[in-house]
Amino acid sequence: MLKSYIAFDLETTGLDPMNNEIIEIGALKVRDGKVSERFMEFIKPQELISPAITGLTGISNDMVASARPARSVITDFIDFCEEDILIGHNIIFDYSFTKCTACLLYTSPSPRD
């Protein structure tokens, strides 16, 4: 059994990492089987959150209105993760959004900043 890892989950504005955005990251850093740190932060999206997504996630436009932009939050999340193993319930979905968002933010000027 793993003793050190990051368990994380995302909430997004849709299902397509190329066209939708991460609006919340939640993560737990586990060391020797115990939670040692937490990372929970909203991300301010470029587009308004639809009523359908609010119904699904419970996250409203008011909740993200004062959130930091994606570049700041993703940078902090990457720093939080260090070189740990990432695990999650729907890991393929969450990892694809994280990777795609990081690539969009750090490989070219992006309107998602």
Regions found by a protein language model. Give the residues of each.
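Conserved non-catalytic scaffold segment of RNase H-like nuclease domains
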Residues: 1-104
